[in-house]
Each structure stands twice: as structure tokens, then as C-alpha cells.
Amino acid sequence: MSKYRIAWMPGDGVGNDVMDAAKIVLDAMNFDAEYIPADIGWEFWCKEGDPLPQRTIDILKDTDCALFGAITSKPRDEAHDELAPELQDKGLVYFSPIVKLRQMFNLHTNLRPCKAYPGNPLNFRDDIDLVVFRENTEGMYGGVEFFPLPESVYDALCENPRMKKWKDVGLENVALSTRIMSVGGCESICNQAFDYANTHGRKSVTLLEKPNVLRETGGLMTRIFRAV
């Protein structure tokens, strides 16, 4: 029996090529794993109305980890138009399977190394060596949106006097995306960034935020960052 069970999710397009290359590397290392095929991506949205079928979620819950390639993601109207004809009157709405996975399994930290290697003619600068920590599940990734804007939501938002100006525009002409941030979410990603810096000998941690404009959400993140 293999030491690890890994959900294998090529997804769409270049994802298949990326996963083929990954398998070559894993096999060359004699990595002891069983790879379980799992469906995800545009094909399953078009055919089934769900880019992340429940059977895939069940596989993910029963494996040690997952390897994922890439997915296609399109705007709402295009996504609807590409559904199978028998699904187009079912009221289905496309939601990114990657965002859904992040929220479902609390995969809130996206870690992106960025390093320049000597001899690469495409280097912007030869001394670049940084790691980006990006929040995956909160902020705009919460996915809480409205269009048109419901009267009940507008009334609640009128606790903030800046909201009243949008009434004159006509609520049927207003789209709203919410930036939801929690104390716990901010603390988690800040702690991970500082822990990484300490563990890997990094000399500084920099926060990218806009608290002078996004005073509540940006301000919350900035205060927590400084406290950590």
C-alpha cells in the first residue's frame, strides 16, 4: 500500500500539461503515492452545472492532499451560455471551484515565492528574493455580492451615511461587492508571515494595504499587523 493518497486534479487547459510534468518529477523521485483522479473544472460546469462535483469533495476528504493544475473561469453570462441546454433554466450560478475549495478547507494562505536566479536574461533585477503571503478566503474573496442591490441590503448599509448617495442612482443600477475581514483571519495570515520570516532568516515583513482609504478593513489589518 502506498504511503500517501493524493487527489489528482488536472482541471482545464494547461493544467493537464502541468500535471503531466509534475508526474514525471514525482516518478523520478520514486515518490511513494497513489494518485486518485478527481474531476474539477469547466467541463463539469458545462456538462453537470457544477465545476466541483460532490464526488470530488468526497475524494479530497479521504486523501492526504491534492495536486491541482488549472481551471477556466468566465464571467456570469458567459458561464451560463456555455451550460448544456437542459441546464440553462435551472438557475445555476458559476462560482469558482478554487475559491470554494479554499473556503471549504480553510486554505486561507496563498504563499508565492518570487526569486531571481543568476544568469536568467529575463530577470527584472538580479537581487529579487521575496515571498508573498496573500489572503485567499476573506476580503474580496468572500464572494458576497449583489446585483441589483436589494432594498433590505441598502437600508442596512445606510447606517453609513456615504451609502445614501446610491439611492439616486437607482438600486437596480448598483452592483455591490463586500470586503469582509475578520480579526482571526488577519491574525492568522500576519502570524504566518512573521513565523516564516523568523524560520527562514528573513529580515523584514512588509504589509501592502490601503488604510487611508479603506479605513475599517485596511485599518483592521494594519493594526493587527503592527500588534503581531
Task: Describe the function of each predicted region.
Residues 43-47, 182-183:
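Short, flexible loop segments at the rims of nucleotide/cofactor-binding pockets, characterized by
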Residues 1-3:
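Basic/polar N-terminal segments that are highly enriched at the extreme N-terminus
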Residues 43, 74-75, 213-215:
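Short, active-site-adjacent cap segments at secondary-structure transitions
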Residues 27, 31, 62-65, 103-110, ...:
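Generic secondary-structure signature for well-ordered alpha-helical cores
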Residues 32-44:
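A short beta-strand-loop structural module common to alpha/beta enzyme folds
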Residues 46-163, 175-176:
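N-terminal glycine-rich phosphate/adenylate-binding segment common to multiple enzyme folds
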Residues 11-13, 40, 71, 116, ...:
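Short, ordered loop/turn segments at secondary-structure junctions
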Residues 6-29, 155-228:
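Glycine-rich phosphate/diphosphate-binding loop of Rossmann-like nucleotide-binding domains
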